[in-house]
Design a protein with these regions (language model features):
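Polar, enzyme-active/binding microenvironments
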Residues: 1-189
Length: 189
């Protein structure tokens, strides 16, 4: 774990179990990481208090290559696995329960927002599609100008950014704004 103070990175507490291809959300002093590889981690959660990690509740569906959004006590995991799955789960700080199913099963997507107002973008098959969550169900939204997988996203359901991608590697960034026009490319490299 590394923590950023606005200008430099410093070491934080180590995870109890190393993992890759999972999802995370929260803040520097209240973080959450869930799922990933190797296989014993595919349904586990760890919570960060700013100095150390402790075990949280286990997910109902083991996943990797999933996306996350929300806070440590109100998180959302979306999709994941190969081939992609359409299920989501919601975390209340103690346990995970089933959420609404995505319109499109996907993995390697990125999420932003909170548990009751989330955005999921890109993923499986180099998709450019986005979906919005209202805490109950998902609806299709605007397409990005570039299909993305293995990329990052940040922000809220109403205002988010998607940055970088793999295959081909790109440093492009797109800005999502709920409304019209919904997607705007702000940099392409």
């Amino acid at each position: 774990t590394e923590e950023y103070n606005g200008s430099t990175w410093t070491a934080g507490g180590n995870l109890a179990s190393g993992r890759g291809y999972g999802a995370a959300c929260g803040t520097q002093t209240a973080g959450l990481i869930f799922c990933g590889n190797p296989s014993p981690n595919r349904n586990t959660t760890e919570e960060y208090d700013g100095s150390s990690w402790t075990a949280g509740g286990n997910l109902g569906t083991p996943r990797e290559f999933n996306a996350g959004a929300g806070t440590q006590t109100a998180a959302l995991t979306m999709g994941g696995n190969i081939p992609g799955i359409a299920t989501t789960e919601e975390y209340n700080g103690t346990s995970w329960t089933a959420g609404g199913n995505l319109g499109t099963a996907r993995y390697t997507a990125a999420g932003a927002g909170i548990q009751t107002a989330a955005l999921l973008a890109g993923g499986t098959g180099d998709t450019d599609g986005t979906e919005l969550y209202d805490g109950t169900s998902w609806t299709t939204s605007a397409n990005m100008s570039l299909a993305r997988k293995y990329f990052g996203a940040a922000g809220s359901q109403a205002e988010a950014i998607a940055f970088a991608t793999q295959s081909p590697v790109s440093g492009s960034t797109e800005e999502f704004t709920l409304g019209s026009p919904a997607i705007r490319t702000i940099t392409t490299t």
